[in-house]
């Protein structure tokens, strides 16, 4: 159905229809409200949904206000109110972003403990990935003891090859006893080394440090890579209690920083 013209009220057919300002117009009826100049979609200006030309388009006028003392006082008061409101909003939202925490000794100790725990977990994951999931963790100390035993035995054979006759090697054992007293008469390299290392302990397990560790608390001990830990007692999965043989200090130590010997 064809709409009616917004100006003359007659039917507007598609050939002469102008759709503008949410209304339908005849091309001849789409003219300026003031001068009746015919307009098009390029040169019209709308005001209150009525078409105007550029010359008669209603312009908004501003009333000039004199700078009287009263107006100046009101202006200054408005600026002060705006500044006060800005400061009020600033102070209100000041603590919502983030708060600065004082760097107390207690917080420093907690931070250092967290760093130590993260370092322990990192080394634990590294050891698991290095030993593999096939149960190689239990065989690692024994393999190292075998290597150590073979390295101890090789210098003896190089230093005194002329003291070991081929006919009776057992009778030459008393001559080798002062040099390697803890070897005994066993020919397996792993067993004499374990006897040599466990003899001075006098009770408890013995462990060897595989990393350097600095004590993070008063009840912990510090040690270096290669130190021997004696009288070791298991506290839980992550911590042990023992004595550093080199320094004589006794306290807690991380379990994944040492290995059994």
Curated annotation (Swiss-Prot):
Record InterPro entries: Lasp1_SH3, LIM-SH3_domain_protein, Nebulin_repeat, SH3-like_dom_sf, SH3_domain, Znf_LIM
SUPFAM superfamilies tied to this protein: Glucocorticoid receptor-like (DNA-binding domain), SH3-domain
Phosphothreonine, modified sites: 68, 104
Pfam families membership: LIM, Nebulin, SH3_9
Location of this chain's protein in the cell: Cytoplasm, Cell cortex; Cytoplasm, Cytoskeleton
Biased composition (Low complexity): 167-183
Residues where N6-acetyllysine is found: 42
Modified positions (N6-succinyllysine) in chain numbering: 112
Residues with the Phosphoserine modification: 99, 118, 134, 146
Modified residues (N-acetylmethionine): 1
Domain of life (superkingdom): Eukaryota
Protein name in UniProt: LIM and SH3 domain protein 1
């Amino acid at each position: 159905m064809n709409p009616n013209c917004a100006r003359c009220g007659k039917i507007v057919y598609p050939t002469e229809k102008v759709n503008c300002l949410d209304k339908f117009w005849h091309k001849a009826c789409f003219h300026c409200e003031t001068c009746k100049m015919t307009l098009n979609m390029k040169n019209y200006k709308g005001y209150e949904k009525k078409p105007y030309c550029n010359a008669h388009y209603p312009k908004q006028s501003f009333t000039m206000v004199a700078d009287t003392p009263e107006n100046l006082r009101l202006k200054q008061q408005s600026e002060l109110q705006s500044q006060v409101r800005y400061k009020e909003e600033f102070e209100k939202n000041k603590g919502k972003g983030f708060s600065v925490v004082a760097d107390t000794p207690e917080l420093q100790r907690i931070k250092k403990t967290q760093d130590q725990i993260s370092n322990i977990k990192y080394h634990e994951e590294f050891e698991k990935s290095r030993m593999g999931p096939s149960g190689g963790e239990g065989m690692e100390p024994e393999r190292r003891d075998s290597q150590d035993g073979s390295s101890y035995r090789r210098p003896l054979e190089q230093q005194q090859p002329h003291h070991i006759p081929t006919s009776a090697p057992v009778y030459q054992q008393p001559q080798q006893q002062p040099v390697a007293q803890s070897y005994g008469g066993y020919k397996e390299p792993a067993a004499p080394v374990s006897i040599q290392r466990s003899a001075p302990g006098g009770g408890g397990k013995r462990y060897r440090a595989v990393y350097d560790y600095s004590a993070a608390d008063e009840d912990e001990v510090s040690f270096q890579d290669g130190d021997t830990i004696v009288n070791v007692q298991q506290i839980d999965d992550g911590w042990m209690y023992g004595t550093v043989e080199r320094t004589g200090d006794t306290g807690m130590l991380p379990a994944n920083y040492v290995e059994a010997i």
